[in-house]
Amino acid sequence: MSTENALLTILVDRINNDTLVLPTLPEVVIKVRQAADNPDVNLMQMSDVIAHDPALSARMIKVANSAIMGRAVKVSNLHQAVTRIGLRQIKNIATAIAMEQLFVSNNELIKGYMGKAWHKTLHVASHSISLMEFYLKRNTHTSLNRDAITLASLVYNIGVLPILTEAERHPEVFANPSFLAHAIQRLSGKIGGSIMKAWEFPDVFVEVAQHWADVNHRTAEVSYIDFIR
């Protein structure tokens, strides 16, 4: 058995034995997502949830003042930011901010992979959302929606993270470009599905993370995975 295959075997064993370290969402993001799914939550209550994390609060204000919101008047506090962004978008923005923080590394090789993975995620998200907008204009009765494709495009490639994290923890063993490329190709889908299940995301996101790169995976009807590929 080659060294590369031996390393892959180690990773596969860790996946099968549930000993591979999976990334976790920050507690505040989990609370934001739960609050956003609560039909009784109002803007003030959402502001109170976000306020427990100063860094997230600052990022929300920055997003609210960004060009994408298209407003000339700047907001100066969290409640104004949440009001401008709206409850519908808060959940995905909080998740995106948390996701960006996961793609960091102190190892130069792994840092490069992390950066490429995150930029690829942003690229795919941009195209997927644009495709969905085009699709929705011509399919007004579909159950697919903008919020779900936004989230799906942010998490579709999450499976690369544990592989890169493992390489960072044991660079002398795993931090090899050839091995990493092979491991990501073979294992990231299965790992991605496991992460979505661990995060208790709906099945549509499990499908996207697990099968987006599997050309043999087909769905009976148009689904979010078709916009990611």
Regions found by a protein language model. Name each.
Residues 1-155, 162-169, 175-183, 187-229:
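Conserved alpha-helical "signature site"
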